[in-house]
């Protein structure tokens, strides 16, 4: 079910303003992240120690956008 807002990076983001969501990794730090691009190239990010946690959160966000 499509949501109107998602909570990300300690903020509520209107899903209509999200341009794209992507998975990223910082292999030097051993961290996995998610970037959310909000209209006008305003990036938000969350970082995780485990790839599985990042993937789970990514799927939650994608489900909220559908």
Regions picked out by a protein language model, each given a short descriptive name:
Residues 8, 20, 36-38, 63:
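Intrinsic disorder/low-complexity segments, especially N-terminal tails and targeting/processing regions
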Residues 41-51:
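A short, exposed loop/beta-hairpin motif centered on an aromatic-Gly-Thr core
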Residues 1, 23, 52:
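Catalytic phosphate/metal-binding cores of nucleic-acid and nucleotide-processing enzymes, i.e., regions
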Residues 50-66:
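A short, charged, amphipathic alpha-helix used as a generic interaction element across diverse proteins
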Residues 23-43:
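Short aromatic-glycine-(Arg/Gly/Cys) micro-motifs in beta-strand/loop hairpins
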Residues 1-12:
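Short aromatic-glycine motifs in intrinsically disordered, low-complexity regions
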Residues 13-24:
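Phosphoinositide-dependent membrane-docking surfaces
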């Amino acid at each position: 079910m499509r949501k109107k807002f998602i909570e990300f990076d300690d903020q509520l983001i209107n899903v209509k303003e999200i341009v794209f969501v992507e998975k990223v990794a910082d292999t030097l730090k051993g961290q996995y992240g998610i970037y959310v691009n909000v209209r006008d190239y305003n990036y938000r990010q969350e970082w995780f120690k485990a790839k599985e946690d990042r993937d789970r959160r990514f799927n939650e966000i994608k489900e909220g956008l559908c």
